[in-house]
């Protein structure tokens, strides 16, 4: 029974990237283990998060599906600067000078002035578990050990946000990292890792938090759920997992209950 279970777990990493149209201008790209969001309107295309460094070809493929080339990306917004969300943005910033924005409290992290990420030692302690072993191999294959940052990363201001495709509104959601930020665009909440609906390490599917080991402050994660619950949206585009529809308070309440 062990081999079929391992094969089932590994299958999560073998599917091709899926691009889901959420609204007229918002698309959720479902990568092998992480998501990113594309916002395309008459003013151009915006990316929210950028997958692992090794997800670059999948990111480019998702842009091509909408008729865009890498040089067409107006800007990249980071929900946070973990390598599975910042990864391909390193290349965009270096090769095309693409502006990369995040919350002011996350800029130093994006520049790699410091690293606020789960310790390799803590992962190693769990690597004997099948899910962790498979995820670890995938992480390494996608460049998850790269420590490069984005020297040009800058803080997103209200004025800048108003000029970007979809006019994204920043929603400060610290906890997973000190400067984690979600974005509300065209009625869709791009929540990054403040609120997810699935992950290769997790059996449960549905609104939830990532395991506490991955977050800077679990208490801040819970407080951020309370902040998200106040938003007027019924569409959740998470950093990991499936698109979720329904009152956002139902999602945050479910995640908070699981975290107790």
Regions found by a protein language model. Give the residues of each.
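Short, solvent-exposed beta-strand-terminating loops
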Residues: 104-118, 188-199
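Conserved beta-strand hairpin/beta-sheet module of binuclear metal-dependent hydrolase folds
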Residues: 14-66, 182-197
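Binuclear metal-ion centers of metallo-dependent hydrolases, dominated by the metallo-beta-lactamase
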Residues: 243-260
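Residue-level marker for buried hydrophobic side chains located in beta-strands
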Residues: 46-48, 77, 100, 189-191, ...
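Blade/loop signatures of beta-propeller domains
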Residues: 2-18
